């Protein structure tokens, strides 16, 4: 009897633990997660809009929807004051992305492909209930519309569209011309393209003679006086005005960051980034241009161009991401200083609109400035960046800096910059944060936060009167769309370690343990190598190379931020220049050596290395320089440096990294080309490449696979005819993970 009672008590105690047992992460779990976008607070301070992408694995489809969540007053606690708790999808019967509130808060614009391709739609909102009362399509442009932006008075919306520059004329003529050319292309049996300059394709698509332009259209559309031309613009045929005519992209394709165009606070001026250099493929000289927004009906493209002005003509490197101050006095933007170097440090600049004077506001920071926003009173800019403290945790955090340059002070003779009247930089958060924006009252910020164990969620932080750097507030989590799924999953936190790498520098590595980790066991290793090469591993979430998913079936995952990685200062980034297989390779090997010696649970006889982009190059380099790994996975990597130069679209990158072209600096291209070390290839290798990869052409993968097969090295190639540099389609991604993990399991003996 006593034994029975004891058994019952044991069961009672253990059942809760059993019911709460978490399981390893699976690909299906990852596809069940909703992908939360940036927060968009309402002007009345009651609501936050955001988009979230749902993945239907069976249908091989990703669909964005618009959601809403209540936002309490900045003096209240958790956001439950309006009678609604948690998030609610408010546009469910069509795809809907990029929500943007109107200035009066009575409606919002969004992008949808429900009818006639990508178009701008308007949703009317009951602000008291946070409910949509109706939707209508605003644009009906054959070339599609995206990137919508409200004018401050709510009367106009700007949007972008890829159009034929030769069609520049009156709005009606331009609409008809574009529609006619698009229809001719669609109906023609001939799909040949004739090129007469470089940058004829980019990323994963051919440009087909089109340019991105910015248009403005009234929200309350009047009946056109001209007859319907059948051009496909419907009631907008005489209304949409091209503000950036000409044979240039406006905005230019981005080197990173937020929107590359913005409206002044009075709605009278547009600022956008565009590159007007003769050979775009070798230039990073994106400049900021300004143009008036309002034009009469008789204005011609030549009139618009005559009023367009380059305000950063003095900088031969990239200027991008303009953002006007709320008081209209300043334009903040990001700038680089070295022409042709896409990995030069992004600086936070401001331009005085009255005088044209420019100033670096975050000069003390030796790191990239990422997303930024103004305070409502225009006194400060909040931005995202990394410093030594954040770097140690693998994070990027939110900072603030005052806007108080002394424009009357003399310029420094060497830097050309003026002294600051006051400079005050403060850390605001600790986390991997991004997408920040202020609420109406200016005392709270909204932002997204992620970690290795959690995809993006929206946070709200009420700013205290005084910040304690040792105890920064975490804020309130507003979105909980993924909590249910994640509560069932066993994940491991990111662990950091440091070791002595190339040049005696301290180099950082990270480690992720498998679920249900047992320190007394030995575990095989997946050694991940990041791309860029100017990128970095950190405490962030990824759907394409997810360390938690790689660890889930019993592996220790190790990642090294080798020389060239971001977050450790510009000198550390620059160290990879013309040294692709030098210091980075040394760091990778020393980092793995350190991990093997430090962590007794690592089985150094069962290690595989995996990498994509530059990581793929590193794998190809490893093939010819060490046989320590049981297997390798090379995804979209450079194999032949000369052919990679001739087939990439962004030629400035190779020109900078290898200090010239193959015909001006052949020694560098030969020295760092993996294909010239093929006689040493021995390690079993899985090659992966996409047909639509124009950054590193698919021929690089074919050359590698051909070489491996000719040498008799065990190898396979996974070829995606419908993917580019990244594998994005859900079922393709499923196949990618299954093939990669299966290959590694095969050679490490995991069953």
Q: Across the structure, where does each feature detected by a protein language model lie?
A:
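Intrinsic disorder/low-complexity segments
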Residues: 1-16, 72-88, 127-130, 223-238, ...
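Residue-level detector of Asp-centered blade-edge/turn motifs that repeat once per structural unit
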Residues: 43-44, 103-104, 152-153, 265-266, ...
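Non-catalytic accessory segments flanking enzyme active sites
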Residues: 40, 158-160, 187, 191-196, ...
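Short beta-strand element of the alpha/beta-hydrolase
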Residues: 521-531
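Hydrophobic beta-strand positions that form the internal "hydrophobic ladder"
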Residues: 45-48, 108, 157, 270, ...
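Active-site-proximal cap/loop segments of hydrolase catalytic domains
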Residues: 528, 546, 551-552, 559-751
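A flexible loop/linker signature enriched in serine peptidases of the S9 family
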Residues: 52-65, 89-97, 109-121, 129, ...
């Amino acid at each position: 009897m006593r034994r029975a009672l004891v058994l019952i008590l044991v069961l009672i105690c253990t059942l809760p633990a059993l019911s709460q047992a978490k399981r390893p992460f699976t690909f299906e779990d990852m596809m069940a997660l909703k992908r939360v976008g940036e927060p968009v607070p309402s002007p009345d301070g009651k609501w936050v809009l955001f988009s979230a992408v749902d993945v239907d694995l069976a249908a091989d489809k990703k669909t964005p929807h618009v959601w809403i969540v209540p936002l309490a007053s900045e003096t209240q606690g958790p956001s439950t004051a309006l009678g609604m708790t948690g998030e609610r999808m408010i546009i469910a019967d069509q795809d809907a992305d990029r929500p943007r509130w109107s200035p009066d808060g009575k409606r919002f614009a969004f992008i949808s492909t429900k009818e006639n391709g990508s178009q701008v739609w308007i949703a009317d909102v009951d602000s008291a209930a946070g409910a949509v009362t109706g939707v209508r399509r605003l644009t009906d442009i054959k070339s599609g519309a995206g990137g919508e932006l409200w004018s401050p008075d709510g009367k106009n919306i700007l949007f972008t569209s890829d159009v034929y520059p030769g069609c520049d004329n009156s709005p009606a003529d331009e609409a008809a011309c574009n529609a006619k050319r698009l229809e001719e292309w669609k109906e023609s049996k001939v799909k040949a393209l004739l090129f007469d300059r470089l940058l004829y394709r980019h990323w994963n698509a051919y440009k087909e003679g089109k340019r991105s332009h910015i248009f403005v259209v009234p929200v309350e559309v009047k009946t056109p006086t001209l007859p319907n031309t059948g051009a496909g613009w419907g009631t907008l045929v005489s209304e949409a005005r091209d503000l950036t005519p000409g044979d240039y992209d406006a905005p230019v394709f981005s080197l990173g960051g937020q929107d590359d165009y913005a409206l002044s606070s009075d709605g009278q001026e547009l600022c956008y980034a565009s590159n007007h250099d003769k050979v775009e493929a070798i230039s990073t000289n994106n400049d900021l241009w300004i143009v008036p927004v309002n034009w009469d009906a008789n204005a011609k493209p030549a009139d618009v161009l005559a009023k367009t002005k380059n305000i950063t003509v003095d900088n031969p490197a990239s200027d991008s991401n303009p953002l006007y101050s709320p008081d209209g006095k300043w334009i903040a933007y990001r700038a680089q200083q070295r022409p042709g170097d896409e990995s030069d440090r992004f600086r936070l600049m401001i331009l005085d609109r009255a005088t044209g004077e420019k100033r670096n506001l975050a000069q003390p920071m030796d790191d990239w400035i990422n997303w930024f926003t103004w305070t409502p009173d225009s006194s400060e800019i909040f931005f995202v960046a990394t410093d030594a403290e954040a770097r140690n945790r693998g994070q990027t955090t939110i900072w603030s800096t005052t806007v108080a340059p002394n424009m009357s002070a003399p310029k420094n003779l060497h830097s050309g910059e003026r002294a600051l009247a006051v400079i005050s930089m403060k850390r605001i958060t600790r986390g991997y944060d991004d997408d920040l924006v202020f609420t109406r009252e200016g005392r709270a910020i909204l932002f997204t936060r992620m970690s290795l164990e959690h995809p993006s969620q929206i946070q709200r932080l009420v700013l205290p009167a005084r910040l304690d750097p040792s105890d920064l507030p975490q804020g309130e989590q507003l979105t909980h769309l993924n909590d249910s799924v994640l509560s069932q999953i066993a994940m491991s936190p990111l662990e950091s370690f440091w070791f002595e790498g190339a040049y005696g520098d301290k180099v950082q590595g990270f480690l992720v343990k498998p679920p249900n980790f047992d320190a007394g066991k030995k575990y095989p290793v997946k050694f991940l190598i990041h791309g860029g090469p100017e990128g970095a591993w950190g405490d962030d979430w990824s759907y394409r190379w997810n360390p938690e998913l790689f660890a889930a079936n019993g592996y220790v995952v190790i990642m090294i931020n080798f020389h060239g990685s971001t977050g450790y200062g510009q000198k550390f980034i620059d160290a990879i220049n013309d040294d692709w297989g030098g210091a980075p390779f040394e760091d990778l090997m020393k980092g793995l050596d350190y991990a093997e010696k430090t962590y007794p649970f690592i089985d150094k006889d069962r290690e595989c290395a995996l990498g994509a982009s530059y990581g793929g190059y590193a794998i190809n380099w490893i093939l010819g320089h060490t046989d320590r790994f049981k297997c390798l996975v090379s995804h979209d990597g450079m194999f032949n440096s000369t052919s990679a130069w001739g087939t990439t679209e962004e030629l400035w990158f190779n020109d900078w990294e290898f200090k010239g072209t193959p015909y001006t600096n052949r020694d560098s291209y030969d020295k760092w080309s993996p294909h010239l070390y093929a006689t040493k290839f021995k390690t079993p290798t899985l090659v992966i490449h996409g047909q639509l990869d124009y950054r590193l052409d698919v021929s690089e993968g074919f050359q590698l696979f051909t070489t491996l097969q000719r040498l008799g090295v065990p190898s396979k190639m996974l070829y995606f005819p419908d993917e580019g540099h990244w594998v994005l389609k859900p079922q393709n991604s499923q196949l990618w993970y299954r093939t990669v993990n299966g290959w590694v399991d095969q050679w490490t003996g995991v069953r």
